[in-house]
Amino acid sequence: MIINSIIEFLQAADIKKQILGIDFGEKKVGVAISNIEHTVAMPLQTIFATNQDRINKIQEIAVAYNIGAIVIGLPFKLDGTETSQTHRVKDFANKLANKLLLPIFLCDERLTSKAANNLLKMGNIKRKVRNAIDDRVAASIILEGTLKRMQNSKSYF
C-alpha cells in the first residue's frame, strides 16, 4: 500500500519492527535501515540490479531484517513539480508494494543526493568510493527525515 501521509504511515506500519529506507535510481538503489527504536537510520547497502532483480533483492532484505514498513524518496524539482524520475519512482513503489504487501511511504527527497555527496566529501572520501556508497547514504538521509517526522507526530506515542 502506497502512503503519502505520515499519520497514515504510522497507522499502517508495524512500529515494533525496523523500517527500510530506499533511494531509487536507474543504475543503483541505495538502502538504509532504522534501528528498532526508530531513532537512527544507518546506510545498509547499494543494489546494482535492474527491473525485477531490484524488487527481489529488496524483498530478501525485508525478510532478512523483518521489516515493518518502507520509506522511498520521491524526487521533485526544486519548485515542487514532478519529473520523469518522479514517475519512475512511483512505478517502482507500486511494483514493490504489490510484491511485499508492506506500507510504503513516499517522501520528498529534494536535495538528499546532493547532501549525501557533500557529507561524503567533508569526510574526505575519494570519488570512486563516494560513487559506490552515495545512494545508501542518501537512503539513510531520506529515512532519517521520516524517523524525525514520526517522533514529532503525536500519534506515534
From Swiss-Prot:
Pfam families, per this entry? RuvX (PF03652)
Q: Does the keyword Cytoplasm apply?
A: yes
InterPro entries in the record: RNaseH-like_sf, YqgF, YqgF/RNaseH-like_dom, YqgF/RNaseH-like_dom_sf
E.C. no: 3.1.-.-
- Predominantly, its location class is cytoplasm
According to its UniProt entry, one GO biological process term is: rRNA 5'-end processing
The terms describing its cellular component in GO are: cytosol
UniProt keyword annotations, A-Z: Cytoplasm, Hydrolase, Nuclease, Ribosome biogenesis
Localization in the cell: Cytoplasm
Q: Which GO terms describe its molecular function?
A: nuclease activity
What this chain does, per the entry, is described as:
Could be a nuclease involved in processing of the 5'-end of pre-16S rRNA.
The similarity annotation says: Belongs to the YqgF nuclease family.
**What HAMAP family does the database record attribute to this sequence?**
Nuclease_YqgF
Q: Record's NCBIfam families?
A: RNAse_H_YqgF (TIGR00250)
Q: What's this protein's name?
A: Putative pre-16S rRNA nuclease
